C-alpha cells in the first residue's frame, strides 16, 4: 500500500492510498481513524477521481461519524471512572 496523496481539510487529516486495485481513503481526527475503501473502476481510476468523490457532503458525513465516535469514547471513559486525560501514563507501557 502506498500513499498517493493527501486532501487538504482544516478539520481532519485525509490520506489517499492505492492498494491492490483499491483506493483506501483514511480520515484521522483526535486519535480516531475512519477508512473507506473504493474499488478502481470506470469512474475511479486515479487520485483526481478520488478527490472529486471525497466532496463536502462526504466529509460532512465523516465528521458526523467522528462526533458520534468521540461521544461513545467519552461515555466509555466515564464508565471507567475517568478519562484518558486523567491517566498520567496514557497509553504508554512501563519501561524497565
Regions found by a protein language model. Give the residues of each.
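Polar low-complexity intrinsically disordered regions enriched in Ser/Thr and small residues
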Residues: 8-9, 46, 84-85
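Short, charged/polar N-terminal "headpieces" of proteins
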Residues: 1-26
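General secondary-structure edge motif
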Residues: 5, 42, 46-49
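Residue-level marker of intrinsically disordered, low-complexity segments enriched
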Residues: 1-2, 30, 48, 52
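Acidic, low-complexity intrinsically disordered segments
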Residues: 49-96
Amino acid at each position: 500500500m502506498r500513499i498517493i496523496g493527501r486532501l487538504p481539510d482544516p478539520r481532519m487529516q485525509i490520506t489517499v492510498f492505492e492498494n491492490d486495485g483499491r483506493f483506501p481513503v483514511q480520515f484521522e481526527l483526535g486519535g480516531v481513524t475512519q477508512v473507506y475503501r473504493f474499488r478502481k473502476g470506470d469512474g475511479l481510476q486515479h487520485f483526481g477521481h478520488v478527490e472529486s468523490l471525497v466532496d463536502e457532503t462526504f466529509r460532512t458525513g465523516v465528521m458526523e461519524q467522528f462526533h458520534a465516535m468521540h461521544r461513545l469514547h467519552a461515555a466509555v471513559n466515564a464508565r471507567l471512572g475517568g478519562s484518558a486525560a486523567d491517566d498520567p501514563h496514557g497509553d504508554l507501557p512501563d519501561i524497565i
